[in-house]
Amino acid sequence: MMTALILKRVAQAIPVMLIVAILTFLLMKLLPGDPAILIAGDGASPETVERIRVELGLDQPTVVQLGQWLWNLFHFDLGRSFLLSQPVSQAIAERLPVTISLALLAFAITIPVGIIMGVVAAYLRDSWFDTGVMSLALLGVSVPSFWLAILAVILFSVTLGWFPSAGYVPFLDSPLGWLRSLILPASILALFQIGYLARMTRSEMLEVMDQDYIRTARSKGVSEYSVLSTHAFRNALVSVLTVSGYIFSLLIGGSVVIEQIFALPGLGRLLVQAILARDLPVVQGTMLFLGFLFVAINVLVDILYTIADPRVRYD
């Protein structure tokens, strides 16, 4: 049963990924500029530019170019970077561990802190703590991440000297150095999602705590801790699980800005540099990879959601 469910969800994701690939290609075609001119240089002759256009297949109709690009994509060929002079897939593979490390560390901070704050806020409804959690949630959607990141660098790196202001240390080189290089950007990245998760957890907990079986458990003399942990939280956790996948996607997307500020050599920084340098194959490949990653995360969350709540059925 579970194998059939997984195969079904993966099969449903394939056309979505195909649409993502086609939209990515078409968006790149809408951008101004000629890749052949970028490769040849401003002083190149028209003959040189035309020769490069033919070599890249840019002289072909858009439909033919799309078909060739999808064929190359099927063979895991994302093209070659103009700026880096290396395959796009290699550039992505080299920088992916940084982005994943940043997102996972931020996720590890967000989930326990956000859930605990949401549970306590629901239990202490209308208290000063509850008000503080709601204020933090509002802060998360109001304050730009780059502004808070710059303040954090000034305070914790420049003034106090607790953390490095930029750079990345691979985990295998130094686990402690890896943690020091990521803890500040990961905390800033997590802060905006902690408020959202806390608000979501609080809402689910309040809804569950108003159910009849919670009142029945309390009337039977069940301890308040057991009511919260065993009955209320376990049932509210199903919805929180769904949100966690969305949060992880947001953390990966938010890493674009954070990586720029903290000079982390991840996918976000690669994408920004490629956009500024008009390195279209890298822009195209990175956007496509991130799109596929988001689809894969959603599929995984759907599967976990069904495992956590067997009542869920897909048509």
From Swiss-Prot:
InterPro entries referenced in this protein's UniProt entry, alphabetically: BPD_transp_1_N, MetI-like, MetI-like_sf
A matching Pfam family: BPD_transp_1
Annotated GO MF terms: dipeptide transmembrane transporter activity
CDD domains according to UniProt: TM_PBP2
SS bonds (residue pairs): none
Annotated ranges, domain ABC transmembrane type-1: 96-305
A GO CC annotation given for this chain: plasma membrane
Membrane topology type: Multi-pass membrane protein
Residues spanning the membrane: 13-33, 102-122, 136-156, 178-198, 238-258, 287-307
Highest taxon above the source species: Bacteria
Keywords: Cell inner membrane, Cell membrane, Membrane, Transmembrane, Transmembrane helix, Transport
Localization, UniProt: Cell inner membrane
Stated role: Probably part of an ABC transporter complex that could be involved in peptide import. Probably responsible for the translocation of the substrate across the membrane.
Subunit structure as annotated in this protein's UniProt entry: The complex is composed of two ATP-binding proteins (BMEII0205 and BMEII0206), two transmembrane proteins (BMEII0207/BMEII0208 and BMEII0209) and a solute-binding protein (BMEII0210).
UniProt record similarity statement: Belongs to the binding-protein-dependent transport system permease family.
This protein's name: Putative peptide transport system permease protein BMEII0209
Organism: Brucella melitensis biotype 1 (strain ATCC 23456 / CCUG 17765 / NCTC 10094 / 16M)
